[in-house]
Each structure stands twice: as C-alpha cells, then as structure tokens.
C-alpha cells in the first residue's frame, strides 16, 4: 500500500492549506448534518456521526457549531437538505478519480465538476467506470514516536487490523475493514496511543506511479475539485515516484 502512504503524506502536508482555504468547516458541517439525518443525533449509536464529530473536533471546530449541525440533521433546527452524489472520472495520465459530493443543486454541481475537469485535462465518466478499482476501508495514522511496529501489530491484530503501511517516514497507516475502525480506535485509546486522521477511505487495488510533471497536473486538478464547496472528498489511484514526492513536498 505504498501508494496510499505517499498520498497520505501529501494530504497531511496539504491539511494546513486546506484549512486556510476556508471551506473545511463547511464540509465538516455538511458531514455532521448528513450523518445525524441518516442515523440520528446520538453519536454513541451512530458511528458515522461519531467519526464526523471526532474529525471536526480534531480540526478545532467549536462544539456550538457541531451541536447546531447535529440539530439541523435531526430537524430540531431548520437547515438545507443535502443530496450525496458520487461522481467518477479520469484525470491526467489516466488517473482514476472518485469525487464525493453533498449538494442542494445537482445540476449546478455536475456542471461545475465538468468545467473543472475539462480545464484540467480530466473528464467525468459514467457510474461504475472506476469504482470497481477501489475498496472502502477504515484507516488511521499512528506516529512512529507513539509506538513501535511490533507493539502496534500486537495491539491491533485482535482489533481488525488488515494491513499496516510503514512507508511514511513519520507515520504508520493502519488499514481495517469499515466495521472494525471503531475497534481499532478503542484499542489505541485504551492503550494511550495517539493517532490522527481516522476516517473511512477509498483505497485503490492498484496504483499508477506518476513522475513529477504528471503528479503536479493531477494535484492541480484535485486541488480545484476540493476547492468546490459541493465536494466532500476526492480519491485517486495516484502513486508518487520519489521525484514527484520530493517535488510536491517542497
């Protein structure tokens, strides 16, 4: 899963920029609202809401904002009704893309996405065109400074660990089945081991390695997509060559 690890490294380095962009809280509020609408406002019985709240809190969202988003989802406060729509397509160098959106206007969203893709050497595809290349998994990152590889594997083998990616120089990436992500988090919490970026992820079965030039083009497209307020997440099967990794890390 080296491609996943390198991509996760770039995503972590982008996180500060993404937050400054100003639309991070908008995306988090949408996710909380949708999760509360679908599964109720009690996070103890709603894993998706619990994960959304944890993500919001890790990004310093005030509890008042979180509670308002929950109440909008449960109908206690008036709010926008969001439709979740997933789009698929291809970017530069044939990279597969899955784009998850939450929108109150489907026509606007698809028009915006087509415009962004066409301006960045990409194109939208039909439903199912690339989804078969990905698996939905749980993932989280554990700093090397918090635990050894042996300790981490021993701790999580009975908590749903499927794969442990060690390619990142600072983090282990833990991969689980979706249903086991909460068990992995609980095991780490009980052991007092810090972790970051716990989430449901789309992980490709195979990666396409890109050189620095193509990687920069794909990153430009992904940045443009993620800047759109209707886009909640973008997934790709891009793997970074060492030259691309060094270039994007500068």
Swiss-Prot record:
Family the UniProt entry places it in: Belongs to the TACO1 family.
PANTHER family per record: TRANSCRIPTIONAL REGULATORY PROTEIN YEBC-RELATED, TRANSLATIONAL ACTIVATOR OF CYTOCHROME C OXIDASE 1
Stored NCBIfam families: PRK00110.1, PRK12378.1, YebC/PmpR family DNA-binding transcriptional regulator
Native source organism of the sequence: Chlorobium chlorochromatii (strain CaD3)
Name used for this protein in its record: Probable transcriptional regulatory protein Cag_0165
This protein's record includes keyword Transcription regulation: yes
HAMAP family attached to this UniProt entry: Transcrip_reg_TACO1
Main location class: cytoplasm
Record Pfam families: TACO1_YebC_N, Transcrip_reg
InterPro entries linked: Integrase-like_N, TACO1_YebC-like_2nd/3rd_dom, TACO1_YebC_N, Transcrip_reg_TACO1-like, Transcrip_reg_TACO1-like_dom3, YebC-like
Molecular function GO terms recorded: DNA binding
UniProt KW keywords: Cytoplasm, DNA-binding, Transcription, Transcription regulation
GO biological process: regulation of DNA-templated transcription
Keyword presence, Nucleotide-binding: no
Annotated localization: Cytoplasm
GO cellular component: cytosol
Transmembrane intervals: none
């Amino acid at each position: 899963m080296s491609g996943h690890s390198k991509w996760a490294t770039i995503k972590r380095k982008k996180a500060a920029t993404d937050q400054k962009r100003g639309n991070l809280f908008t995306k988090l509020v949408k996710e909380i609202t949708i999760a509360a609408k679908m599964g109720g406002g009690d996070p103890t019985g709603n894993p998706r809401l619990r994960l959304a709240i944890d993500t919001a809190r890790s990004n310093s969202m005030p509890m008042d904002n979180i509670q308002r988003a929950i109440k909008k989802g449960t109908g206690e406060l008036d709010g926008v009704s969001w439709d979740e729509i997933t789009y698929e397509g291809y970017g530069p160098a044939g990279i597969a893309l899955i784009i998850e959106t939450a929108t109150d206007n489907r026509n606007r969203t698809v028009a915006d996405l087509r415009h962004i893709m066409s301006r960045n050497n990409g194109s939208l595809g039909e439903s199912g065109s690339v989804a078969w290349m990905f698996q939905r998994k749980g993932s989280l990152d554990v700093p090397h400074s918090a635990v050894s590889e042996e300790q981490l594997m021993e701790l999580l083998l009975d908590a749903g660990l499927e794969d442990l990616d060690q390619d990142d120089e600072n983090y282990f990436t833990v991969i689980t089945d979706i249903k086991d992500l909460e068990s992995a988090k609980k095991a780490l919490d009980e052991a007092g081991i810090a972790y970051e970026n716990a989430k449901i992820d789309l992980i490709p079965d195979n990666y396409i390695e890109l050189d620095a030039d193509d990687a920069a083009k794909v990153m430009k497209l992904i940045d443009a997509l993620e800047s759109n307020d209707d886009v909640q997440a973008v997934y790709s099967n891009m793997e970074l060559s060492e030259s691309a990794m060094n270039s994007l890390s500068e």
